[in-house]
A protein has these predicted regions:
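An acidic/histidine-cluster motif and surrounding catalytic segment
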Residues: 1-41, 46-180
Length: 180
């Protein structure tokens, strides 16, 4: 943190004990969202394209009040799909957590235990967002594993569920802006 090459305000939040990865990420993002309306989230092993910062800054501002949009991907695993697009992004239901941005309004609805999962038409939700049967089966297993589990081993399936349950779209760049 001391070697940052740009001027910025730095907040350091230290924990007195190891709470585990899932709870640490949630607590850390709760803290960040208590101070900021929109956040770019990246992990320590990710490299972002220099243009990703402008991409996120522009879109986090442009769509901050648009509740149809819940997530900004920085990954595009199929850039050939968007070959010839004139825009720098498109809307998708695919939520990628390898570098992303979102808003406080979305993070406040995130719940590690996913209590809504047991109360909805699960097959209907999965059919809406997953076209392949194998994908639906795999994601259902992961959602079942994390639903009402106060000791989950990951945080990201709950985030995907949060976005899908709220029927939000993700902004996806036409070219990949993040390497994991």
């Amino acid at each position: 943190v001391k070697s940052l090459s740009w001027e910025c305000e730095v907040h350091i939040k230290k924990e007195s004990s190891n709470k585990g990865m899932v709870h640490q990420i949630k607590n850390g993002l709760d803290y960040v969202f208590s101070k900021h309306e929109g956040v770019l989230f990246m992990q320590d092993d990710q490299l972002l394209s220099p243009s990703s910062y402008n991409f996120v800054t522009e879109l986090i501002t442009k769509y901050k009040d648009d509740e149809r949009i819940g997530h900004i991907n920085l990954s595009n695993f199929n850039p050939s799909f968007t070959k010839g697009y004139s825009s720098s992004y498109f809307f998708s239901s695919h939520i990628k957590v390898w570098g992303f941005a979102t808003w406080r309004r979305m993070w406040h609805s995130y719940n590690i235990e996913m209590p809504e999962w047991s109360q909805i038409d699960q097959n209907g939700l999965l059919r809406k967002f997953c076209s392949r049967r194998n994908e639906r089966i795999g994601i259902k297993k992961m959602f079942d594993l994390h639903c009402n589990n106060n000791d989950p081993w990951t945080w990201d399936y709950q985030w995907v569920f949060n976005c899908w349950y709220r029927n939000t779209l993700a902004i996806t760049p036409t070219r990949n802006l993040c390497i994991d």
